[in-house]
Design a protein with these regions (language model features):
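Conserved short alpha-helical segments that host acidic/polar catalytic motifs at enzyme active sites
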Residues: 1-124
Length: 124
């Protein structure tokens, strides 16, 4: 579920059941994005880590919580899932001076690397 505002782009892929956080937003992705922003005290990666940890504790069941976010200069990734790694595991590839992240490798391209479960990363 993608979401954007004037400052950044946010992508959520997953399923959370019984989330108990207080956050503004019209859709789930916007609520999670605003929750992460509320944790940001100048270190976006630390804010993402803290927010994801709290959301996991305040959620009855996390089937998957894959997050990508970027402000145009910094891109961040968090990947967590409890089941079905063939579906929820993310992949990355470096090509043409860019880092690519997606849910499934492109067909016919063999240089995609699997992103481990419970990964938190700054994407160069």
């Amino acid at each position: 579920m993608p979401f954007s505002d004037d400052d950044s782009v946010f992508i959520f892929n997953g399923e959370l059941r019984g989330v108990k956080i207080k956050s503004e937003g019209r859709i789930g992705a916007e609520k999670i994005y605003n929750y992460i922003r509320r944790m940001d005290k100048g270190d976006k990666l630390q804010a993402l880590d803290k927010a994801v940890s709290i959301i996991k504790r305040r959620t009855e069941y996390v089937r998957a919580m894959n997050i990508l976010m970027s402000d145009g200069e910094t891109s961040l990734l968090s990947s967590d899932y409890s089941e079905d790694p063939d579906y929820f595991q993310m992949h990355r590839r470096r090509s043409g001076g860019m880092e690519w992240v997606c849910s499934q490798p492109y067909p016919g391209e063999n240089d995609w690397q699997r992103i481990a479960n419970a990964t938190l990363a700054l994407i160069p």
